[in-house]
């Protein structure tokens, strides 16, 4: 039975008495405190910012984290800072957008972030990419991805030239990224060197396109192509996981799963990669075979003709899927 979280007992020392949080907000706060990695799947207007602010401050008070980084869309930066300080007037927060990372400002900003005991650093999605991790760590992650592609290539039928060429192309892209990292200078403080041991991402659907290796890309509902933004978050969260296991990442969005089966796989990689790895489900094909049901139906094409289309239609083994994810997302 999935664990139920009840935050009605929370007192929230330091919070302004001008606000009374709703039950769902307290459930979300307690879920993050009790479990760490969490997906706040709360609707737009449900007060996610205050939920995240209170979760940060309570974890700080309890010694569960040292410094959080709250990543928000650019147009929400000022609002997020205002709401954070409205709920916790005494909070020590540092606010930054991409203008803080121009060549003449980035060293100063990172030094300021590292040398003061901030409760939270609030930063925009676009500025987040300037926060680095050690090149050696990202290189190892790319090597691990390359090994997955090599394993898939051994399983491709010899006459399936299309799949082989597609996998080879994706593999070359990873090799190019690896070469670029080999020449990159690590002359800036990394995310752990500035003291961050938890990342909280608002509007996390912007990071949902995390690439993965698969031989199923011809199926409808499977999109293995990813974005640099998603990969960037994945690397940083995996790095923080080595420093603060179980509390590296919290995601928040009103639209957690939108279009494809692969998005659920990406969420699990973000929040529970170790659980997938121990079960041998860290490869998409094994995961999809376990939790996805394939169906073929005739669909009307623009030409007016019907064509059989095979797609991932539904999730199966849902109780097991939820068990791997931990307790279900807070609603």
Where are these regions (language model features)?
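Hydrophobic residues on the short alpha-helix immediately C-terminal to a glycine-rich phosphate/catalytic loop
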Residues: 32, 43, 54-59, 80, ...
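Walker A/P-loop
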Residues: 35-55, 67-69
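Glycine-rich, phosphate-binding/catalytic loops in enzymes
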Residues: 46, 57, 86-88, 137-141, ...
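Conserved Walker A/P-loop ATP-binding site and its immediately adjacent core
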Residues: 51, 64-101, 105, 125-130, ...
């Amino acid at each position: 039975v999935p664990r139920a979280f009840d935050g009605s007992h929370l007192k929230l020392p330091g919070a302004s008495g001008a606000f009374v949080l709703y039950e769902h907000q307290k459930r979300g706060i307690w879920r993050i405190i009790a479990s760490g990695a969490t997906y706040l799947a709360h609707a737009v207007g449900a007060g996610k910012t205050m939920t995240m602010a209170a979760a940060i401050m309570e974890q700080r008070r309890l010694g569960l984290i040292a410094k959080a980084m709250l990543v928000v869309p650019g147009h929400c930066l000022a609002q997020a800072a205002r709401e954070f300080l409205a709920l916790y007037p005494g909070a020590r927060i540092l606010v930054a957008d991409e203008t803080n990372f121009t060549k003449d400002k980035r060293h100063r900003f990172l030094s300021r972030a590292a040398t003061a005991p901030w409760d939270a650093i609030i930063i925009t999605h676009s500025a987040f990419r300037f926060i680095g991790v050690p090149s050696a760590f990202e290189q190892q992650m790319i090597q691990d991805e390359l090994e997955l592609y090599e394993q898939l290539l051994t399983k491709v039928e010899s006459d399936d030239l299309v799949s082989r060429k597609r996998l080879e192309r994706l593999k070359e892209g990873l090799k190019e990224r690896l070469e670029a990292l080999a020449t990159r200078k690590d002359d800036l403080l990394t995310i752990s060197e500035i003291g961050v041991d938890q990342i909280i991402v608002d509007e996390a659907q912007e990071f949902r396109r995390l690439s993965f290796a698969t031989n199923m890309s011809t199926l409808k509902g499977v999109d293995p192509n990813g974005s640099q933004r998603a990969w960037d978050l994945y690397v940083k969260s995996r790095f923080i996981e080595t420093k603060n296991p179980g509390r590296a990442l919290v995601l928040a969005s009103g639209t957690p799963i939108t279009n494809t089966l692969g998005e659920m796989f990406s969420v699990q990689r973000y929040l529970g990669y170790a659980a997938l790895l121990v079960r041998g489900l860290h490869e998409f094909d094994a995961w999809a075979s376990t939790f996805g049901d394939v169906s073929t139906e005739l669909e009307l094409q623009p030409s007016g003709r019907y064509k059989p289309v095979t797609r991932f239609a539904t999730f199966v083994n849902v109780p097991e899927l939820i068990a791997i994810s931990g307790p279900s997302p807070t609603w």
